[in-house]
């Protein structure tokens, strides 16, 4: 199961935008693009001048509800599940361009509250109300400061308990394209944000959001690096940043139904049994799928073999969801989080419509592994019937 939410606020912090007293006080709270940038010698002077960006999500009460134990959490529909693996996802707004040097971005948890503001980088004069490289709220207001109350320009972040292994980062190797969507595992930070003090040895922190930046060493050295652009929460596209809570919700209930023979994958087809065609944004959708043989063996019986429901082999079937217009996969296959379940009526899976953008059409696709295998793919089966998410 994947339950995703879009960000509530975000902003890019620029070390220097223009010459003058307000050069590090520019607010960009409603820009449609979030930037990681490093400028060396330019019209701004001798650098380097960096940018980082901040982003915050309102964590749902349903996720917070398990915080007292960290053993169970509660779905929006009231059912319980184990602590989720949580991913922070950004969609690239860069052009296709290969990197000449390796580069990587990292995520840290912000330690102070901040005002997103309503400025743009292009504003003249500069908008100084809202967070900036120097201030958390406005020019002349409160500086960014670390836990020792020392000014920390560029945003203050929490330190990591005992091990740097919890620092999420994305590595861009030489030859990678800048036009790459990225996903960070932020389960550690979400656990700290939702835990009660002292639970499982975690030090509770307040949810002030995340900072995405380059490694400090890469920011201050003299190397020339590329710039990264991602769509913000203010984009007019479908590519808003997302926080994805993922867990295994699959169930396999013993059934009197027969297993579908997948020995010859080109001789089977899969379809939806209960597609309503449109679903309200915010509801949890339960799709029932049926697998059948294209050419069932002829038998003498009072019922047609074409009416017999058979189930897909246990642990071999997974789903994905594609945007019908763009052809892009919006819920990708995952051998843990998109497993197909079974009950007495047949195979099914559930998705939250909040994972999808409203007023768009989507298509399901089923992936099958060889029976008993978790690696040998035998076929992909696009579902002919599409569906729409409506407001």
Where are these regions (language model features)?
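Secreted, disulfide-rich extracellular signaling modules
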Residues: 1-278, 290-295, 317-320, 331, ...
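Extracellular Ig-like/FN3 beta-sandwich strand-entry sites
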Residues: 83, 205-207, 282-284, 314, ...
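Extended, charge-rich low-complexity regions and/or helical-solenoid scaffolds
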Residues: 310-312, 316, 339, 343-354, ...
